């Protein structure tokens, strides 16, 4: 796996204060999807699995071109944070109060500080992380659906029926076939 998929990470990014922005403003999910597409189209990453939950996202992605995962995350969070702020300014300015920053270098803070990048270093770990991502909408406090393939903002359907919902997604045959 390390030679086939080097620099592959399981990453969790959470909204600051765990505000449910993706649930309260479903259009903000498309900001994330479009940003994923941009990262893939620009050759910065390959995305193997993802889920967007009400206040966080999980991704299994491969960082390309000699970049660090931290640089990609910083760029992604800066870009999506700005777009989410602009969107909220247009649709519900009061909601932005949840994100007022106490730092002098920014007015708002959308994302929490990221600490959760785990290098995926085996085929088993890859399968475990992708299954975890796909089951996220069916478990515990985050349960929104019974069947993970019916949750739109996830790669689960692509792994069950080879759906092409998301052009930026690279489906791994090893995971589909369970090997």
Model-derived regions: residue spans:
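Short catalytic/metal-binding and nucleic-acid-binding patches
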Residues: 1-179
């Amino acid at each position: 796996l390390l030679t086939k998929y080097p620099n592959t990470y399981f990453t969790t990014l959470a909204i600051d204060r765990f505000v449910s922005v993706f649930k309260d403003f479903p259009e903000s999910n498309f900001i994330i999807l479009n940003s994923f597409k941009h990262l893939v189209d620009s050759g910065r990453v390959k995305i193997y699995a993802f889920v967007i939950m009400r206040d966080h996202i999980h991704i299994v992605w491969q960082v390309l071109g000699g970049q660090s995962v931290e640089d990609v995350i910083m760029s992604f969070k800066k870009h999506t944070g700005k777009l989410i702020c602009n969107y909220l300014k247009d649709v519900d300015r009061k909601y932005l109060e949840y994100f007022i920053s106490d730092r002098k270098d920014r007015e708002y803070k959308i994302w929490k500080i990221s600490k959760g990048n785990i290098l995926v270093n085996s085929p088993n770990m890859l399968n475990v992380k992708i299954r975890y991502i796909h089951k996220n909408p069916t478990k515990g406090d985050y349960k929104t659906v019974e069947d993970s393939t019916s949750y739109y903002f996830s790669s689960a359907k692509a792994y069950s029926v080879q759906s092409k919902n998301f052009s930026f997604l690279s489906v791994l045959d090893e995971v589909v076939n369970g090997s």
